């Protein structure tokens, strides 16, 4: 793809996103054919939307998630500033076709992680993290048949990014805890609807975090101080509808909350 084709694809994605519409897929003249081209469209999307990348997300961190959207591994996407909300926020679902919520561990960095030749170790990544937050992601796609378009087009679609609720910071010591075994419960309208753990996220949220850092490193993209990484859903995605109230309960770590409307 040349730069004009990349820009055209980004404009089509952002046009559908901002209008609350969906498209079958990107037309052949501006369709990414591999993951590199998909990431190039994703980067152009931030310029077209005039939105900062406040953080990063990881889609398809479980085998079930990968099978659902027909990809062979996880996908990195950007959390645009406009769609990052505080704990307790209300999100409008009127244009959301996926209508699911995901409970996630979110890590925030106190320093830049520059591009380097060698892969970062878990210890190196963890040393750059100063906060663990509790999050709820509300993904979405701008494609009608998002399970069929393939990894390159899903990356162009920002790895199905949409809304992100950043809940409270975990105040208890967590770096010496086994996050893989940490239980996460989701309650919808007061009733428990899903139970999972950090093990559902590439085996561990910290493993997923390290994967994301090195995926960016491999592509020459650094992580910046104060950016966050939300590491994927710990539970089976929970169906949601306007009027629902959701709580992601991380036990002694705390809870993240949000509600849904339809305007």
Kindly give the residue locations of the regions a language model identified:
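A conserved acidic, glycine/proline-rich C-terminal tail/linker
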Residues: 208-237
